[in-house]
Amino acid sequence: MTLSFITRWCDELPETYTALSPTPLNKARLIWHNAELANTLSIPSSLFKNGAGVWGGETLLPGMSPLAQVYSGHQFGVWAGQLGDGRGILLGEQQLADGTTMDWHLKGAGLTPYSRMGDGRAVLRSTIRESLASEAMHYLGIPTTRALSIVTSDSPVYRETVEPGAMLMRVAPSHLRFGHFEHFYYRREPEKVRQLADFAIRHYWSHLADDEDKYRLWFSDVVARTASLIAQWQTVGFAHGVMNTDNMSLLGLTLDYGPFGFLDDYEPGFICNHSDHQGRYSFDNQPAVALWNLQRLAQTLSPFVAVDALNEALDSYQQVLLTHYGQRMRQKLGFMTEQKEDNALLNELFSLMARERSDYTRTFRMLSLTEQHSAASPLRDEFIDRAAFDDWFARYRRRLQQDEVSDSERQQLMQSVNPALVLRNWLAQRAIEAAEKGDMTELHRLHEALRNPFSDRDDDYVSRPPDWGKRLEVSCSS
């Protein structure tokens, strides 16, 4: 089958990019590819058998028109000016059989006009982390970009240490960012901002294209998608780590995996990025930061969208987030109905977990084994303050009994939303260290495991992290 690529971005937004081709690495070699995703995208298996090829930027497929996008943004709450694809190149937009499209974005593809002081490269460590994280999020059911392939090489890349240069092929329906809009707003070019909005609506919100109120309805949906995404992050214990406006997807996808982390111990103020000295992007601050970022996006639209309409959409954010979050947390607790005491029970559990630094993922997974008429719980042994747990657990069981649902039905629901496996940093680090020594076994094994996060396991993937694996420091360097 011949893959079809179109050039909408090139043709319709000529002032938003620079056309250029990737710069190949030295002795590049393909070490992993996503066979399931490739099959979904109808990519012939032969493309993965001919060396690095397109996956290493050595060749282009017919119809590709590579480019680097320009955008700007606020970083850590401060206007950073022009940014852009400093090491990534959008190779092309694949047209799928159902009419939808998928961007092919090659990360680590070399210098671009937007590289600033960088070298245009990515390292093996960061490409492995992003491939694992994006696939983990996908199989958890959370909107995200996807990873299609990883190429490593003999090219040295200088970060804190010398690391192997690598490339990641990332795919997504769109790479439109809040920062695209900010770029032209701060250049005082509101018509270019409107062109971006029209492009987004035309191709991703086409049902609104002919509506006279299209901008208000579109922005309201961007707000709702963002609120839903953040709610889902919070329920699985995911911390993004660098929620700058240029890392915010217009489509509500998880974008740009850098110093991310899943909670080990339940720590509301968890900071996964060791460069985040003020805790701006801490786990519990993510909902507020996302709203702040939406406010920055709204500002860019204010020249042609009524401020009252923008504020109305922004005002809906908290309720949408709380609705999604509440629904999912009730499912995680096994509640089939909504009762007035639900929030209190959840908050008391969180308080107990925070005091004892309970493992977030294991606690909810073990809670899924609860039998409503039995005071015994395997979770009890996880707590030091048994009296406090017993008090909470007795009230929790009484609450379960109100729903008049069998244990088996409730447990099935809970186990479908409480993963046994999340991508803990130590698991990623173990795969990285092996890969850097030339052994890709753990990389492939972990990728396979992450495809089934809700399945019971009895290996170390679902155990508590070892002492060395807790509080691993992760930086923005990639």
Swiss-Prot record:
GO molecular function term, any single one: ATP binding
Positions annotated as active site in the UniProt record: 246
Record's keyword terms, sorted: ATP-binding, Magnesium, Manganese, Metal-binding, Nucleotide-binding, Nucleotidyltransferase, Transferase
Pfam family, one: SelO
Role of this protein: Nucleotidyltransferase involved in the post-translational modification of proteins. It can catalyze the addition of adenosine monophosphate (AMP) or uridine monophosphate (UMP) to a protein, resulting in modifications known as AMPylation and UMPylation.
Family indicated by similarity: Belongs to the SELO family.
Protein name, as recorded: Protein nucleotidyltransferase YdiU
Organism whose genome encodes this protein: Escherichia coli O7:K1 (strain IAI39 / ExPEC)
